[in-house]
Amino acid sequence: MLDKFSKGRSASAHVIVLGNEKGGSGKSTVASHVAVGLLKAGQRVATIDLDARQQSFTRYINNRRAWAARAGLDLEVPAHFCIEQGRTMRIADDEELECQRLIDAVNALERNVDFIVIDTPGTDSYLSRLAHSTADTLITPMNDSLLDFDVLGSVDPTTYAVTGVAHYAAMVRQVRRRRRQLDGSNIDWIVMRNRS
């Protein structure tokens, strides 16, 4: 999947992915702040929402655009795509379709922007894993709770020592390793405390 995506890219905007398999961790909120912060800093920014079911990021961008128009303000608003998951009866066809949709969106955006901010759903999916593997920077927001930490590692309930790597951290480790093997680049991974 990453091989095809890398071959399909035409330029080199910095891709920032907000990811965490746990819902409610603050991915869409942080994605909105990152995108607007970059716009306010004078950067050219585009955004992609991969959570087509919930569309929190998409609604934020659309509401910002509509409010600016109603208020007559020249407010910074990024170019935006919302990408749906494939819905055929064949997994391979869905994955091919999702990969192509993401390639097309990134190609349409990255020639004209400095940053692409991608918001992912709070579930494991092919499209989410593909986005993770294409990140230059991955930001994982999490709340200050052992329930949120559970996607990163197992914790001994008595000593609070980390006793193992959990499913999400294992997936991130895998895509980072694959990216290094493919093109020699590193994915910077930032785990941030949210709502502190």
Language model segments and positions:
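Pre-Walker A adenine-sensing motif
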Residues: 1-10
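Intrinsically disordered or low-complexity boundary/linker segments at protein termini
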Residues: 10-14, 153
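P-loop/Walker-type NTP enzyme "switch/lid" segment
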Residues: 15-25, 39-115, 122, 157, ...
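Hydrophobic positions on the alpha1 helix immediately C-terminal to the Walker A/P-loop
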Residues: 30
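Active-site signature of alpha/beta-hydrolase-fold catalytic machinery across serine-
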Residues: 33, 37, 130
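Conserved catalytic-core segment of NTP-binding enzymes
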Residues: 41, 118-196
